[in-house]
């Protein structure tokens, strides 16, 4: 991707990475991604907004040079300091001797540890601060937890362009700059939703705050950090509406209490059945279904768990631990919004029975309200033990009303 123009004085100089399939270890990126970066030229000064991943330094530098000499850059603005935004910074600053680096207060702390260069020429950009490039003003808007504590937005009122950082972005790569040229809009929408869920899903209240700030501006163009540039009359309004819809507080119509489990020989599954029976005896209107983790898509189960009012999770003990699919599901727990969510842990074991206490410890570490110390049976549960499981489910349901 070579440099392209957003407006007469704003240019996209970012990088396409269509081959990326995993981002930040855990995010699948079926449609690749882009590392968006922009140059804003005023009559007197030039600003570079965001940089890119270190892997692409040479190509990125060539894109910058298509627009300006790096030595003529006065400001390097990082709306967010994650390495996909700041990766080339340490090398780039050597070519930009007059450039001041503008970041948020939190960003100034992160950047020193990301670059290991404590002498970088960093200036903290506070909420409401601005720089004048000569006919072009860049105003800074604090946007913490969208999606890091350091995040901010940069607004150019003269051009009605918002540099939105990761907000309204997507891990999606087509060889076009604008949303008006997308060849596969359905795939983009899929990537947009997946990106929101993974990046912003844990922060709905902050998303609402950010939308309030964005809606107060007369935005015609959103230059985000990943995916196509969004324009008024095409995808911009749609994207804002989706964020608004997805981040609004939602209450389940009936109590949602899913029970997730894995079972080697069906014994943990039998316990799950009885726990469900006990829960429904106390809360008959609850949506309490049982899900064999190996039989369902992990993303579906993740969404269900994170929407739940309470949940159960069960595992046999194999090799002195819970089994891998159960740990995999818990690795997708929204650790921020899961705090104080009631959880019930159960399982059958043959020898030592570590699965239940290990899962209990993990959920307590996530600040879940784990019910008692869980429920365990040895090998095949007897009828008496199954009745105890049902009573355990009833007591768990009763605890939800307290």
Residues covered by each model-derived region:
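FMN-binding flavodoxin-like domain, especially the glycine-rich phosphate-binding loop
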Residues: 174, 184-222, 227-229, 274-291, ...
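Active-site-proximal loop/helix segment associated with metal-binding centers of metalloenzymes
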Residues: 147-151, 159, 167-201, 246-252
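Terminal amphipathic helices with adjacent charged low-complexity linkers/tails
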Residues: 226-255
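Active-site metal-binding motif and surrounding structural segment of the metallo-beta-lactamase
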Residues: 55-102
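Active-site neighborhood of phospho(di)ester-bond hydrolases with catalytic His/Asp-centered motifs
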Residues: 49-51, 73-81, 101-105, 162-165, ...
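Conserved beta-strand hairpin/beta-sheet module of binuclear metal-dependent hydrolase folds
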Residues: 3-66, 153-156, 160-164, 268
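Metallo-beta-lactamase
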Residues: 5-8, 103-151, 203-209
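Short acidic active-site motifs
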Residues: 88, 296-301
